[in-house]
A protein has these predicted regions:
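Juxtamembrane and boundary regions of transmembrane helices in multi-pass small-molecule transporters
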Residues: 2, 6, 65, 88, ...
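Alpha-helix capping and helix-loop boundary segments enriched in small/acidic/polar residues
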Residues: 3-4, 22, 51, 69, ...
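Membrane-embedded alpha-helical segments and adjacent helix-loop junctions characteristic
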Residues: 13, 34, 38-131, 276-281, ...
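Helix N-cap/coil-helix junction residues
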Residues: 22-23, 41, 74, 130, ...
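Transmembrane helix boundary and interhelical junction motifs in multipass membrane proteins
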Residues: 24-30, 75, 109-118, 151-158, ...
Length: 423
């Protein structure tokens, strides 16, 4: 059995275990990565390489910032203000939190946005007396959809643009992706205020013990104006800095500085900071990063795309080709990191489009949007993974509303892309 087939078999088994849900997701992710290393698909170092990477540091640091928001009472204060504005209805809370997430994720890391908003959404839900778990799926998905408003909304957008421009093809300006991204955001809001809301798991499945630990403050401690002010200032600085993050000042480093300031000023103790980190979430991200690497280096991802290309034949219909590119990219991004997905499919599909006299920019736009649609699995994106523990969410909780959203995203995109970028 070659490396590509081995990887696909292991991924299939992992998917089944994700669906069944009897084994913790973090254990499944790490076991899959370790097995791939034992079979020689990836190196032993690859299994743990993500744990020294920026994503893991960013996740851990933002979890600490979120804990500080609760410990200083900032989350409660913000939630109190927002509940007065939105009311205590589920629709009001979804509308408010999703709108903010959509806008912020257009210029900031989706993972950073969810990590920052998670404590506020939890506090709002608890104050309003609505299900915490039902608010987390729309929040997570919004952070993925919102990145389609600008070209810098996601690293995968920037990667796609770079790969296409390296081929000598002029791609998009800063806001041009928003021609499709803005209608998608509107459709997203309408979806979760109507049909999507009904597809969310009924009741509150959230981990009450975890939420109690996550949201508690010191007994009898009142809101501290000084420490609360420091916490808000640090949060705003992190948010602004993320907009201007670059290779010299990456987002994970900025978030780490924020954590150091919060601990140094007493907004959070060292022990509280350590307890704030949800280690199972980090193991899921780390393990799936290794699996994503295996999909790339083994040729498993290319095997899937080659199969699709062979099905299309030598002279496919232009709309059919666009639909296939979108579908394949969207399916892959639920199994691989979105940046890995675009690095795989862009060099394959764009030259084919050029050879078939199909507008390569339209194909690039489809790749950007589809790569930011990880709605089918809890491990498709770091934003999804962040919500697993507090919401006690499983595969079905993501797949059921995510399937409808995937269909909607694809339908809207396939209608609008040929209008703005004729095939």
């Amino acid at each position: 059995m070659n490396a590509a087939v081995t990887t696909l078999v292991i991924l299939a088994v992992m998917t089944v275990l994700f669906v069944v849900g009897t084994i913790p997701l973090g254990l499944v992710s790490m076991a899959g990565a370790i097995l791939l290393a034992c079979l020689g698909v990836i190196t032993k170092a690859d299994v743990f390489s993500a744990f020294s990477g920026g994503t893991i540091v960013l996740l851990g640091a933002m979890m600490m910032v979120g804990q500080a928001l609760f410990h200083t009472g900032v989350a409660d204060k913000l939630a109190e203000i927002m509940v007065k504005i939105t009311g205590t209805t589920e629709n009001g809370i979804i509308l408010a939190t999703v709108s903010v997430a959509l806008l912020l994720s257009s210029i900031c890391s989706g993972v950073g946005v969810v990590a920052m908003m998670l404590p506020i959404v939890i506090a709002m839900s608890m104050k309003a007396g609505v299900s915490v778990s039902r608010q987390l799926i729309p929040l997570s998905f919004a952070a993925s959809v919102g990145c389609n408003l600008t070209l810098i909304g996601a690293a995968s957008n920037v990667s796609t643009a770079g790969l296409i421009e390296d081929m000598g093809i002029k791609f998009l300006t800063f806001f041009e992706l928003g021609k499709v991204g803005l209608p998608l955001c509107i459709a997203f809001l309408l979806y979760f205020l109507t049909i999507g809301k009904k597809l969310l798991t009924p009741g509150d499945t959230s981990d009450k013990a975890y939420l109690e630990e996550y949201t508690k403050r010191e007994p009898g401690k009142k809101f501290d104006n000084v420490k609360g002010g420091i916490c808000i200032t640090v949060l705003i600085c992190i948010l602004v800095a993320m907009v201007f993050a670059n290779s010299q000042w990456p987002m994970y480093f900025i978030a780490a500085i924020g954590c150091v300031i919060l601990i140094a000023t007493g907004c959070l103790s060292e022990s509280q900071a350590m307890r704030a980190v949800d280690w199972p979430t980090l193991f899921i991200v780390g393990g799936m990063s290794a699996v994503s690497k295996a999909m790339s280096v083994s040729g498993a991802g290319k095997m899937i795309t080659d199969f699709v290309v062979s099905m299309l034949g030598t002279s496919p219909n232009k709309m059919m080709f666009l639909a296939f590119v979108f579908l394949v990219t969207m399916l892959l991004t639920n199994m691989m990191m979105n940046t890995s997905t675009v690095v795989l499919v862009t060099p394959l599909f764009v030259p084919i489009a050029v050879a078939m006299n199909i507008n390569p920019v339209a194909i690039g736009v489809a790749i950007c949007i589809a790569a930011s649609a990880p709605f089918l699995t809890p491990v498709g994106s770091g934003t999804n993974t962040l919500c697993i523990r507090p919401g006690n969410l499983g595969f079905r909780d993501f797949f059921v509303p995510g399937f409808g959203l995937s269909v909607l995203t694809m339908a809207v995109s396939l209608v609008l892309i040929p209008i703005f970028w004729p095939l």
